[in-house]
C-alpha cells in the first residue's frame, strides 16, 4: 500500500499488529501519526515501534563540548531535512495520549561507532548488542530505542470478515475490486488504482 501515515487507508481496528521501524523519524507530526496507528490497530493489539533517540550518549557528549544541540529539551530535533530524533519522554507522553501502554523497551545500536566497527568483528558487536538491549533499556542512552506497546481497550477476538481498507475520500469501508487494476468505493465512487500489486491511495 502506498499512502501517507497521517491518513492510512485502512479500516478502524483492521490490524492485529503494527511494526514501524526506521520510519517514525520522518514524521513531522508525531501525535497525528500515533493517533492514526492507534485507529487502525484493534483494542489489545501490539505496536512495535522504533525511534531515533535524541537523548543518546554521543549527543550528550557533543553538547557538553558545545558541538551539538541540547539533547535534554523535549521537542523533536531535526538533524537533517525531515529527519527527526525524539526525546524518550516526549514519545512516551504522546504514546499514552494516543492510547498505547508500553510493555517492553530495548536499547538498540549500542555500538554504533565507526571505530568500534573497525576494531571488533561484526558478529561480536551484534552478540553484545543483543545481550545488553534489556539491561541498558532503562538508561535510554542509545541512538535507537525499540518499544513494544499495547493498544488500549478490550482485547477480544476480532470478528471474522472485518473490513480491511477505508476510502480516503469518504471514509467508507465498502471497497472491492470490480477490476484487477483498482479498488472501487461503493459509497462515493472513487477508484483507487492498483499498479504492479501496489494499492495506491495518493
PLM-predicted stretches and their roles:
Residues 1-11:
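Conserved SAM-binding strand-loop segment of SAM-dependent methyltransferases
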Residues 66-69, 93, 97, 103-179:
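A C-terminal cap/extension of S-adenosyl-L-methionine-dependent methyltransferases
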Residues 70-90:
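Acceptor-substrate binding/catalytic loop of class I
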Residues 19:
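A conserved beta-strand element that flanks and buttresses the S-adenosyl-L-methionine
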Residues 46-71:
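Conserved class I S-adenosyl-L-methionine
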Residues 22-23:
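Short catalytic micro-motifs in class I SAM-dependent methyltransferases
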Residues 170, 185-190:
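Short Cys/His-rich metal-coordination motifs, predominantly Zn2+-binding knuckles/fingers
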Residues 31-46:
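A short glycine-rich, Lys/Arg-flanked "PGG" loop and its adjoining helix->strand segment in the class I
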